[in-house]
Amino acid sequence: MVLSKTVSQSDVSIHSTFASRYVRTSLPRFKMPDNSIPKEAAYQIINDELMLDGNPRLNLASFVTTWMEPECDKLMMDSINKNYVDMDEYPVTTELQNRCVNMIAHLFNAPLEDGETAVGVGTVGSSEAIMLAGLAFKRKWQNKMKAQGKPCDKPNIVTGANVQVCWEKFARYFEVELKEVKLSEGYYVMDPEKAVEMVDENTICVAAILGSTLNGEFEDVKRLNDLLVEKNKETGWDTPIHVDAASGGFIAPFIYPELEWDFRLPLVKSINVSGHKYGLVYAGIGWVVWRNKDDLPDELIFHINYLGADQPTFTLNFSKGSSQVIAQYYQLIRLGYEGYKNVMENCQENASVLREGLEKTGRFNIISKEIGVPLVAFSLKDNRQHNEFEISETLRRFGWIVPAYTMPPNAQHITVLRVVIREDFSRTLAERLVRDIEKVLHELDTLPARVNAKLAVAEEQAAANGSEVHKKTDSEVQLEMITAWKKFVEEKKKKTNRVC
């Protein structure tokens, strides 16, 4: 079963205009061709199809790095054929990963003694990192419950409803109940008080988010830690905290060094961070570090020797490329603390330019906070005539990819547009985006509202039938518009290839 959708379900042929210089036969779409074709033709066919992809630099939906220095690109290409798991064959690559783990652990204030090495691993992203951290929490909790002679078959984890989907995957794949703290209008992150109220003896950990996907806001990890310390004292439990710092882990240490969210807090036992977000590496690298070796149960670590030497491993996959690990090490030594600080401050300044430009239009409410991930989340003050989904769709004509989405349960009537500010998003682009948004608003203002047009037709028909039309409330109209546009966007997505 193919989970992603394709443009056509029929096994029609693929043709390419310029590839006809090398080959005149068409290619089947879903079957391997019987014969070989020239390399020039294969390249041209694929290149022609990829032209219809969006421009990664203008993809403002993604947190993932889309630009690196040419020197780092060369290092990555030079190591693209190295399988990272062959540690005995590529010992220097393994050493570079270990250096990265230790640098990140020190960045997060891990309580390491002089000469002590950090406990952590490189992953293909924060999703795998969260799976590994969750498994460690689950196994530690199971061992504790078994030692106390208590049942250990109903673990749960407490999170906010704003968590990324990988937390839902962890809960479903590894049979852990997910207890979500609902959001509310104006408060789009987990409330520490409500989270601690949901903690019970079966809670393996509370997950705090440093940089919400929805609006970039940092959750109050220190407040959560303090409340949980008190609850643990009252109950005799030892419920720990995991910090999902996928987005904020490479931001907070450089811009908000006084903010306590990491291993300075005693209940924080593990932290994950995405190297391919604000770690400034192309997609495919994440990290998870533990407070100390006692927080990672030994029985989860495998030892293999069929690649030439005894190798401890704790991953969900086996083979993976070395390029991203090498690229992460390059960025850490190339930029250093000063360089990362400069990049993050520049991102924040560009986010401020965009925020101020949107505020000057007088048309938007800014949902994101100034302290947090450098992004701008905003919604229309008045969406009775046109909504955020229409703005998102129309902006694509200018090349911009700006997502529109609804908030999670209890705040799902709020629709938001979000622009992520990455290193390659300049002040000039921010100013240009504001101008293009103003053009879109002007264009939409000149068009009749779809809901009003439908209402006029309904009133006409009702008058002819001698009946009355029930006019919906503003909130009913808003919800109807959001639902319709959400369905429209989802249907469009089904018609194009999507990564699962």
From Swiss-Prot:
Entry cofactors: pyridoxal 5'-phosphate
Modified residues (N6-(pyridoxal phosphate)lysine): 277
Function per UniProt: Catalyzes the production of GABA. The calmodulin-binding is calcium-dependent and it is proposed that this may, directly or indirectly, form a calcium regulated control of GABA biosynthesis.
Signal sequence region: none
Region annotation (Calmodulin-binding) ranges: 469-500
EC number in record: 4.1.1.15
GO biological process: glutamate catabolic process
Keywords, in A-Z order: Calmodulin-binding, Decarboxylase, Lyase, Pyridoxal phosphate
Subunit description: Homodimer.
Gene Ontology MF annotations: calmodulin binding; glutamate decarboxylase activity; pyridoxal phosphate binding
Family membership: Belongs to the group II decarboxylase family.
GO cellular component terms, semicolon-separated: cytosol
Name by which UniProt lists this protein: Glutamate decarboxylase
Catalytic activities: L-glutamate + H(+) = 4-aminobutanoate + CO2
